[in-house]
Amino acid sequence: MMNVFDLFKRRSSAPVARERLQVLLAYERRNRSQPDLVSILREEIMAVIAKHVQIDQDYLQVSMDRGETMSTLEIDIQIPNKSAVPMAIAG
């Protein structure tokens, strides 16, 4: 049962990102002629990741394979290990 106060709770970013991706993929299925959907997805995915991890844009690859009945979205992200990222020294 849904509580009225649940409508005002802040949702975590993962479910929100997943919901946005599902909406975009559903839209893409209806409008297959839109060529730059992959670039839109890439920008939105990069924005979500940048909120949590600092990565170079060159390390994010997004591709879409469009089939007759199904489209496949492939996302390749190289995230540096925490030990490889230099820490700022507090002064």
UniProtKB/Swiss-Prot annotation:
SUPFAM superfamilies: Cell division protein MinE topological specificity domain (SSF55229)
UniProt xrefs under InterPro entries: MinE (IPR005527), MinE_sf (IPR036707)
GO BP annotation list: cell division; regulation of division septum assembly
Keywords: Cell cycle, Cell division
Primary role: Prevents the cell division inhibition by proteins MinC and MinD at internal division sites while permitting inhibition at polar sites. This ensures cell division at the proper site by restricting the formation of a division septum at the midpoint of the long axis of the cell.
Family (UniProt): Belongs to the MinE family.
Descriptive protein name: Cell division topological specificity factor
Originating organism: Mesorhizobium japonicum (strain LMG 29417 / CECT 9101 / MAFF 303099)
